[in-house]
Amino acid sequence: MWTWVLLTLFYGLTKGGREIVKKKALEISTVIEVLFFYTLIGFLMLVWDAGNAVSVIPGRLPLIALKSFVIFVAWICGFKALKSIPLGIYGILDVSRMLFATLLGVIIIGERPGAFQIAGNAIVALGLFMLGLQKKDGGGEAKPHYIVLAFISAFLNAVSGTMDKILTKDVTSSQLQFWYMLFLLIFYGLYILLGRTKMDVKKTVKNYWIWILSLMFILADRALFMANAIPDSKVTVMTVIKQSSVIVTVIAGRLVFKEKGLAYKLLCAAVVLAGIVVSVL
């Protein structure tokens, strides 16, 4: 059990770090510039494995393409929200994907969470509700439409996570990562071409935060796909463990972006952490 738990924990903590890097990257470049180039750089890191990727079961490619489209929309929503919402609040709002993923895991995959998993979900939901009681944040007020975008992103990421569990039954983690990134790159390319989006290529390439983001993304996703491929792993539990990212985002919101209200956010994060611990018992 502990292998997939540790892999998922690595993903969660790295994801928290990625939110910091994303926000720093968005201070220099636009949302679509960051998305396209960080996806491109990430894909180039995987090109060496193309020989293995082409042996994927052809019938799985449409489902991988669908997963990529889901993430394509999720990332646009998530990046737009992150650019305008204080990091500490965004990180805890993103925890809502756990509730969505648990529901999808039960309905689609047929998982049956035990008493500890149900209790853990309830505790994490409490932490999210507590955050909602805090109306304002020193780093700026979160406008309703950006909160909606954050929730849409969380739901679509939960859909993607459920698809991962289905796909990794007969697609290796390296194959899934290669094709998923390739399709994602195609979607962003079409978005730029059809929308005639202007890109400051020179400035974006020099944005070193994007390079760091790409490396973190590739490492974290590979760990997550490996965890999903382990037969004993459960989406309902993995999703709760992923929320360890909220600890990183709350602390970074204060240390890096000087956001206020740290004590209350840490309390919310502590409640979330307690829920994670209970869920893996």
List each language-model region with its residue ranges.
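Juxtamembrane helix-start motifs in multi-pass secondary transporters
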Residues: V34-L35, Y90, L176-Q177
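Hydrophobic transmembrane alpha-helices of multi-pass small-molecule transport proteins
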Residues: L40-I41, L46, L103-V106, F116-K135, ...
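C-terminal transmembrane-helix exit sites in multi-pass transporters
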Residues: A53, G78, L99-A119, F129, ...
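Alpha-helical transmembrane segments of compact multi-pass small-molecule transporters, enriched
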Residues: L40-M45, L93-I107, F183-F187, A220, ...
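Selected transmembrane alpha-helices and immediately adjacent juxtamembrane segments
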Residues: P144-Q177
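Membrane-interface interhelical linkers
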Residues: M1-F69, W75-I85, L133-L149, L182-P231, ...
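Hydrophobic/small/kink-forming positions within alpha-helical transmembrane segments
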Residues: G12, G16, V47, S68, ...
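Membrane-helix interface/capping residues of multi-pass secondary transporters
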Residues: V31, L87, P113, S173-S174, ...
